[in-house]
């Protein structure tokens, strides 16, 4: 019983490693232009999230000050 469980686990690991190898074979290093574009989009997303957090934070802070005089 334990031997079959071990074989199942090893087969699962072997399949996973095979899939990882397939992905690595088709992937490539991004070009400089792709890297710059990805960096810009990521930076814009981070700034947008920060702005949304700030917009939520400011009214809540003022409402707390109005409620607890």
UniProtKB/Swiss-Prot annotation:
Query: Which residues does UniProt assign to the signal peptide?
Result: none
Pfam family example for this protein? SecE
Q: What gene makes this protein?
A: secE
Please tell me whether the keyword Glycoprotein is annotated for this protein: no
Job description of the protein: Essential subunit of the Sec protein translocation channel SecYEG. Clamps together the 2 halves of SecY. May contact the channel plug during translocation.
Disulfide bond entries: none
Where does this protein come from, organism-wise? Methanococcus maripaludis (strain DSM 14266 / JCM 13030 / NBRC 101832 / S2 / LL)
Q: Which UniProt keywords apply?
A: Cell membrane, Membrane, Protein transport, Translocation, Transmembrane, Transmembrane helix, Transport
User: What name does the UniProt record give this protein?
Assistant: Protein translocase subunit SecE
């Amino acid at each position: 019983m334990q031997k079959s469980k071990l074989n199942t686990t090893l087969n699962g690991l072997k399949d996973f490693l095979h899939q990882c190898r397939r992905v690595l074979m088709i992937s490539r290093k991004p070009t400089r232009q792709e890297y710059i574009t990805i960096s810009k989009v990521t930076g814009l997303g981070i700034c947008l999230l920060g702005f949304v957090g700030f917009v939520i934070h400011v009214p809540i802070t003022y409402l707390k000050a109005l409620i607890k005089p």
